[in-house]
């Protein structure tokens, strides 16, 4: 968790003050090593010369996301000076504020630090300071609750106290509260993805999602008997090989006008995916505890929205199952009847996530009549082959929604790339024996999977995010060192903030 970090805000005038001369003072420089006026004042007349001499000795060039640590000069109220590089003027013009916050937090881990957000040519805004704080919080996250033997330096993984100093510190403090709400949502999602499947089975996942009621979210949990009444033959088939019964959790945040249709966020929640009868190879199967990354993102997003009292109506829905093989498991060649009435020939029991989504989407459309649907799922290995582990695949039937999601991804760094949906992909899932089959062959696997889901969204604007490459075991970044990334929470929050909240 990121519980060890405390972030406050203060005026630039505090740059030269410190508790008993202890802790760190953090200043920023570009590739010309110039200090901002507040940093110069804090360091005194010889400060710039001190930094220049230390930089020359250590071959520090002020490159973006580089750092230099040295003993602080006398009288600055700190015992260590940390100089963080911002790069060239071009680099500074496109500063990634969460990344800068995460990098800075990593350089002052376990210490008290005053961070002077001031450098030549830039007046740091409250919003930018909030993004900086968000990155710092996310960087300090660690999932170590099951480790009984901590490393000797374990305490150095979190910041004791970080005070961000800038001109508009009052507004920045308000932005910091928003950053805390958002980071809490991301951290919740990371925790869920990182949990082992013997702990996070469907009923336990549903229990944790239900805790959002404390924030004012309305919770409804569907158990198997109710699913059978609704005719959810697709989802129930996936679950029938497991001793752990499935759950569907419906989470409603009613922050907008009562008559306004909600935005629906839908997540695949396969808490462990063995592949079922079409069992996966042993190598890497342990990663399949993360096959619920889409559901985790939806829960995290609802947490963030409710915590900041978002002015909109949002319904989150997650289908939680375990896909296991036993004598009662569903089989290749089975024909299932989904809640929509459409029939599905099972070709591969390891193509289970789309079956779960089909019934959850139908239920959400019928019960809430959403204005738009965004589903998130760790759906296919094919999307990793196509896009790697830095970007998610997006499929959509609506250009406006797709454009808005793309913009939210660019703004947050949770980037998406739109993939094609053409009739040929839809034709590939036609079945000789049922309305459709659950796989479309070897080629274009991500697209045929999306085409399957598309058959269930009716005429609602819809986007499908295949997050198999980014939700777990993705490339490390300045704001994430966790196996479970919590990917999607920030994107969904930004999408709703920019396009669905009342102004």
Swiss-Prot record:
Is Metal-binding a UniProt keyword of this protein?
yes
Which species does this protein come from?
Methylobacterium radiotolerans (strain ATCC 27329 / DSM 1819 / JCM 2831 / NBRC 15690 / NCIMB 10815 / 0-1)
EC number of the protein: 3.4.11.1, 3.4.11.10
Q: How is the cofactor bound?
A: Binds 2 manganese ions per subunit.
**Which keywords appear in this protein's UniProt record, sorted alphabetically?**
Aminopeptidase, Cytoplasm, Hydrolase, Manganese, Metal-binding, Protease
Report the domain of life of the source organism: Bacteria
Q: Which Gene3D superfamilies match?
A: Leucine Aminopeptidase, subunit E, domain 1, Zn peptidases
GO molecular function ontology, one term from the record: manganese ion binding
Recorded GO CC terms: cytoplasm
Key word Hydrolase present = yes
| Family listed | Belongs to the peptidase M17 family.
- Output the GO biological process annotations, alphabetical, semicolon-separated: proteolysis
Q: Looking at its record, which EC class is this enzyme?
A: hydrolase
Residues recorded as binding Mn(2+) 2, renumbered to this chain, are 268, 273, 291, 352
The record's PANTHER family line, in alphabetical order, gives: CYTOSOL AMINOPEPTIDASE, LEUCINE AMINOPEPTIDASE-RELATED
Q: What is this protein called?
A: Probable cytosol aminopeptidase
The record ties this protein, via Pfam families, to: Peptidase_M17 (PF00883), Peptidase_M17_N (PF02789)
Main location (coarse class): cytoplasm
Q: What does this protein do?
A: Presumably involved in the processing and regular turnover of intracellular proteins. Catalyzes the removal of unsubstituted N-terminal amino acids from various peptides.
Q: Which residues form the signal peptide?
A: none
Binding locations of Mn(2+) 1 = 273, 350, 352
- Cofactor annotation: Mn(2+)
> What are the catalytic residues?
280, 354
Q: Which reaction does it catalyse?
A: Release of an N-terminal amino acid, Xaa-|-Yaa-, in which Xaa is preferably Leu, but may be other amino acids including Pro although not Arg or Lys, and Yaa may be Pro. Amino acid amides and methyl esters are also readily hydrolyzed, but rates on arylamides are exceedingly low; Release of an N-terminal amino acid, preferentially leucine, but not glutamic or aspartic acids
Compartment(s) where it occurs, according to its Swiss-Prot or TrEMBL record: Cytoplasm
